[in-house]
A protein has these predicted regions:
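Sec-dependent N-terminal signal peptides
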Residues: 5-17
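C-terminal motif of bacterial Sec signal peptides marking the signal peptidase cleavage site
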Residues: 21-24
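N-terminal secretory signal peptides that target proteins for export/translocation
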Residues: 1-3
Length: 278
């Protein structure tokens, strides 16, 4: 049962980890290109801060159309997690990367296409031996049809499992203890919180030219660094770096016009019945 829940959690994380961080950017699909790199030696003056606040507000307005209804949006994303954390008194080493595409339509249906490579290791306190988990795969999810697909290679405790599986999306998320309703995502509230951070006297803001910002702030007692990059057509890309429970986390979100496509030959994906050879 523990293994089933672990696999469900890994797959669900691939599908929805970034669904609560929706922002708008545009036309910078090459995630290997570090568009945020710059010489952030200049402290932002009052005019630059006002422009930054205006740009942040645009993130909220881009999420709706002229009639105030949800707009169709698309995002390229890259997430990295690396470091050591404590779990039940044991040190767990984690190194993971997730990349992909996340889109929403006017009806707030969410589609995702993600690839992930995740490895974790910990020492078994009973045997004092190192135990490792390795996961590699691709996943697709469609809230409108309530379907999810995964092409996975999973290894744990010396046992391997690989294959193509089809899931009931709600059941998958339920097994992982995750419940996400895109309609509950309050873009305006998130942007207002961000603007409050910008107004904090302890927040440091640096600029490089008129289209790059670096923000150093404390959020809930944790130091975070955010980068904003404004494209030529005025849209915003966003990167967040921080540390949580000993893990270095980076989230990079950029706009795209691409659409999520179903995997080829979906008939090759067998329904997952929860039975694993572990």
């Amino acid at each position: 049962m523990k293994t089933k829940k672990l696999l469900a959690a890994v797959l669900a994380t691939m599908l929805v980890l970034t669904a609560v961080m929706l922002v708008a950017c545009n036309n910078t699909d090459d995630m290997s290109n570090n568009i945020y790199e710059g010489k952030y030696a200049t402290v932002a003056d009052e005019k630059a801060v006002e422009q930054l606040q205006s740009d942040v507000q645009k993130l909220a307005t881009d999420s709706v159309d002229k009639d105030g209804k949800p707009a169709a949006l698309g995002y390229r994303l890259a997430i990295t997690v690396k470091g050591s954390t404590q779990k039940d008194g044991t040190t767990v080493n984690i190194d993971g990367k997730i990349e992909g595409l996340l889109t929403t339509d006017e009806k707030q249906n969410v589609s995702a296409q993600l690839s992930a490579t995740i490895s974790a290791s910990t020492k078994n306190p009973e045997t004092n031996e190192e135990e490792a988990i390795a996961f590699k795969g691709n996943a697709w999810a469609f809230s409108e049809s309530n379907k999810a697909y995964a092409d996975i290679d999973f290894q744990m405790a010396g046992t391997k499992i690989s294959g193509k599986y089809c899931f009931d999306l709600k059941e998958l998320l339920g097994n992982a203890g995750i419940e996400i309703n895109p309609g509950d995502i309050e873009i305006d509230e998130a942007m207002n919180q961000f603007k409050s951070i910008l107004a904090d006297t302890n927040t440091k803001i640096y600029v490089d030219g008129d289209n790059k910002y670096k923000i150093e702030a404390t959020v809930d007692g944790t130091m975070v660094t955010a980068y904003l990059f404004k494209t030529k057509d005025g849209n915003i890309c966003f990167k967040l770096e921080g540390t949580a429970d000993g893990l270095a986390v980076s989230v990079d979100l950029r706009p795209t016009q691409d659409k999520v496509k179903s995997p080829e030959k979906t008939d090759e994906y067998g329904k997952f019945d929860g039975k694993l050879p572990f």
